[in-house]
């Protein structure tokens, strides 16, 4: 149990939980759900963890989850808010979102800026 509490403290610190939970536009109950899912995953005793249909070594998943910060969490919560499609297995969806956030967030925002600057169907200058 001490291991879980140690990870909880580390994760809450990594994501700046206190500041994030008081931010306007942040649904605290959803934030708390994400935190618990991160802790459950990081504390898993499995050797492999399935994410988006692929098995990943638990150490790799743990490492990536421990690198999550407030920006990643805000990104995930914002994308969830924008989602209009039915999600059949929310746990699997959130695990994939958490795992992929550190490697997709910058590309998402770059594409969004490109769309805002040049509009749909407009080619960027070379």
Question: Which functions belong to the PLM regions below?
Answer:
Residues 1-126:
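Electrostatic interaction modules used in gene-expression and signaling proteins
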